[in-house]
Regions:
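Acidic, Gly/Pro-rich loop/turn segments at junctions of secondary structure
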Residues: 1-17, 91
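Short amphipathic alpha-helical segments
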Residues: 15-18, 43, 94-97
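Active-site-adjacent beta-strand anchor residues
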Residues: 21-22, 48, 66, 99
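A late-sequence structural motif
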Residues: 83-124
Length: 124
């Protein structure tokens, strides 16, 4: 794919290639389906992953192309193992909302996650 995607590519061209995405019953699938539909294109996943962290290994095995958060792919992009495909259409910004129950104590993992999310939000 490295030679095919040196220049920005349209979503219309992108759907000609095998596509890896989360399953149809996920908000991520709905998010990208809407993104493609806003540009008049029907998105279909050739391969569905159960979790977001399964997409990158599938891409690395040349099973197709997929959307994942940039921080998850940054290292392998920098190493030249995979490429970031430049798009003509600007992907929509995706936001998350952090909610918590302040009436009960949080686990250490929950506190670490909360801290990571807030640090990531401060960078933007």
């Amino acid at each position: 794919y490295k030679d095919m995607f040196k220049e920005p590519v349209s979503l219309k061209k992108l759907v000609e290639y095998p596509f890896i995405c989360l399953g149809k019953n996920t908000s991520t699938y709905d998010f990208y389906t809407r993104f493609f539909l806003e540009h008049g294109i029907a998105m279909t996943a050739d391969t569905e992953a159960a979790t977001i962290d399964q997409i990158l290994p599938m891409v690395r095995q040349n099973l197709g192309i997929g959307f994942i958060p940039e921080p998850l792919a940054q290292e392998v992009i920098e190493q030249g193992i995979v490429i970031q495909v430049p798009l003509l259409e600007e992907p929509p910004v995706r936001e998350i909302c952090f909610v918590e129950d302040k009436s009960s104590p949080h686990s250490m993992v929950a506190n670490v996650l909360k801290e990571m999310l807030f640090r990531a939000g401060e960078k933007e």
